Amino acid sequence: MIEVLLVTICLAVFPYQGSSIILESGNVNDYEVVYPRKVSALPKGAVQPKYEDTMQYELKENGEPVVLHLEKNKGLFSEDYSETHYSPDGREITTYPSVEDHCYYHGRIHNDADSTASISACDGLKGYFKLQGQTYLIEPLKLPDSEAHAVFKYENIEKEDEAPKMCGVTQNWESDESIKKASQLYLTPEQQRFPQRYVKLAIVVDYRMYIKYNRDSNKITVRVHEMVNHVNEMYKPLNVAITLSLLRIWSTRDLITVQSDSKVTLGSFGDWRKTVLLKQQSHDCAHLLTDITFTKNVIGVAYKKGMCDPKLSVGLVQDYSSNVFVVAAIMTHELGHNLGMEHDEDENGKKCKCDTCIMSPAISDPPAQLFSDCSKNDYHTFLTNSKPQCILNAPLRTDTVSTPVSGNEPL
């Protein structure tokens, strides 16, 4: 039986509540302050695990109590998850950290069936939740001897006036290489009855991004974990589990030429993945996180229908926003292309017109969290026609994929 931890968050007036403040997510011009206070349901004197499997948080929104129910995302890491960086002389240094007792959660708001939440509890509470159609973010205020957190709407993050950020995939663009279909094996009745798919994702961080975060590998690692936790949450409605298989940080130099032409860089990364990375550790798809500025306002690109192909199961994502939620939305979009999804609206304005869906060609504001019906149909067509075999394999841990939590479930 899983013990439940109840935490009451008390709202309080902060001296500069409502004024602008600089947070990790950016400059925020309107926010509320909350003070988390734990009220444990465990018996007095019982030993509490560092991070409980199930937690509840209660806060007040417009004077009404809101109950946030969270469950640990046990599917976040693969059993063989590894982290690699490089010594000054270029030697690979690989570790296999213990990640079973991690601090990343998904959840729902009680009595709000359309709600979602993706939260890190590693150092305070950080992440987002969707309540009554509105996206809120929460993160700790870095104050000495204080448990204060800021809660704010995404729309209250100050943004620069700039051209729309675009995906580099166009309607007619395809790789010069055909995608091999040799892995179209027979599906067992069990696989047909249980259509869950599992993507073991490899994340590679380029040298520019390493410099951007002041050569702090730990900070980058936490950011990537938060990012993939968000991506995993957004793929749940499609019954796709995104599992982080490996994290590699190019901490001395880039191992390919990362240039502003996104499609050239994507091709180079695909070659490197096929000839180097795939031979070192098993995974299904690899994405390169970079701090380079691509031409034509491109912030991401991936091969359409490339999933499971040795060279084409790759994508590029620019770490262009300090808000990890925004970058996670870009990664979710590019993974959609890997899984056979087209843009919701093509160059002729046809197909699904959905400016607030994940596969819109331009990133929406706030970033979309839902796939359109067209995207779901594209994905199902890809599964039927291409039969990507690699994503049929469930992770080895028996507790990897947890049951989604309904917003209407009794707590």
Curated annotation (Swiss-Prot):
Binding of Zn(2+), residues: 333, 337, 343
Localization in the cell: Secreted
GO molecular function: metal ion binding; metalloendopeptidase activity; toxin activity
Record's function text: Snake venom metalloproteinase that impairs hemostasis in the envenomed animal.
Assembly description: Monomer.
Span of the signal peptide: 1-20
Active site (catalytic residues): 334
Cysteines paired by S-S bonds: 308-390, 352-374, 354-357
Keywords: Disulfide bond, Hemostasis impairing toxin, Hydrolase, Metal-binding, Metalloprotease, Protease, Secreted, Signal, Toxin, Zinc, Zymogen
Similarity field: Belongs to the venom metalloproteinase (M12B) family. P-II subfamily.
Tissue specificity statement from the Swiss-Prot or TrEMBL entry: Expressed by the venom gland.
Source organism: Protobothrops mucrosquamatus (Taiwan habu)
Keyword hit for tRNA processing: no
Xref: Pfam families: Pep_M12B_propep, Reprolysin
The protein's name in its UniProt record: Zinc metalloproteinase/disintegrin
GO biological process, one term: proteolysis
